[in-house]
Design a protein with these regions (language model features):
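N-terminal nucleotide/polyanion-binding subdomain common to many enzyme families
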Residues: 15-90
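S-adenosyl-L-methionine/SAH cofactor-binding core of RNA-modifying enzymes
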Residues: 76-124
């Protein structure tokens, strides 16, 4: 019995879930609803869930940033809201990978993309 590509994708390839934590999740919606990512979502290959870091912010104003340690220009993301969000997500399911984005991190390339494609649940 021959199966369609849609059937194979839906029933034999496990769905991947990517949770993205962002200070501005609305800015992420548009690029994630077009092109290859849109088709992957429509075919049930990937589920992408955006999380607003401000929901985990500190104090009355839900603060997620702080001044740079040691002075200097700019702001940095506080660790408490990030850890609170990640811990909540980890309580809901098992994650294969948690990726912390930083300016001096590893370059995302095809090799990294291939390795991540083998993971089922990822937090970025």
């Amino acid at each position: 019995m021959a199966h369609s590509t849609e059937w194979i994708i839906r029933y034999l390839i496990p769905m991947h879930r990517i949770d993205i934590i962002s200070v501005q999740p609305k800015l992420m919606e548009s690029p994630l609803n077009h092109s290859i990512v849109k088709r992957a979502k429509e075919k049930g290959i990937v589920e992408i869930v955006l999380h607003d870091l401000k929901q985990y912010g500190l104090g009355k104003y839900k603060q997620v940033d702080d001044t740079v340690y040691g002075g200097g220009a700019g702001m940095v993301i506080r660790c408490e809201p990030v850890f609170d969000c990640i811990n909540k997500l980890k309580a809901e399911r098992d994650y294969d990978e948690v990726i912390y984005m930083c300016p001096d991190g590893e370059v995302y390339n095809q090799r990294e993309a291939n390795q991540l494609s083998l993971k089922k649940n990822i937090i970025i």
